[in-house]
Amino acid sequence: MIRKAFVMQVNADAHEEYQRRHNPIWPELEAVLKSHGAHHYAIYLDQERNLLFATVEIESEERWNAVASTDVCQRWWKHMRDVMPANPDNSPVNAELKEVFYLQ
């Protein structure tokens, strides 16, 4: 498994809405993530700084990257763009984090 972590932002007035939209996520999005090898996906909110920290274990970079081209992912990004900064393609603005410690 490959462990990934990344940071995103959520609009200051959208914390509750962001959480509501993720509880639960669309069943078809969950199915796509799982079928593309994503496991143990978690998102954490830093309310003071409006930051979202995400962690996920993936089976391969290629399968993970392929999620972005699925119809359901494209629809999800469009659905979320009003509660968080988004790129021109509607994907959330994010930055990958470098793992500096891991205790198994």
Curated annotation (Swiss-Prot):
NCBIfam families referenced in this protein's UniProt entry, alphabetically: YiiL_rotase
Family: Belongs to the rhamnose mutarotase family.
Catalysis performed (reactions): alpha-L-rhamnose = beta-L-rhamnose
GO annotation (BP), single: rhamnose catabolic process
Keywords per UniProt: Carbohydrate metabolism, Cytoplasm, Isomerase, Rhamnose metabolism
One term under GO cellular component: cytoplasm
Gene transcribed to yield this protein: rhaM
Protein name: L-rhamnose mutarotase
The protein's Enzyme Commission number: 5.1.3.32
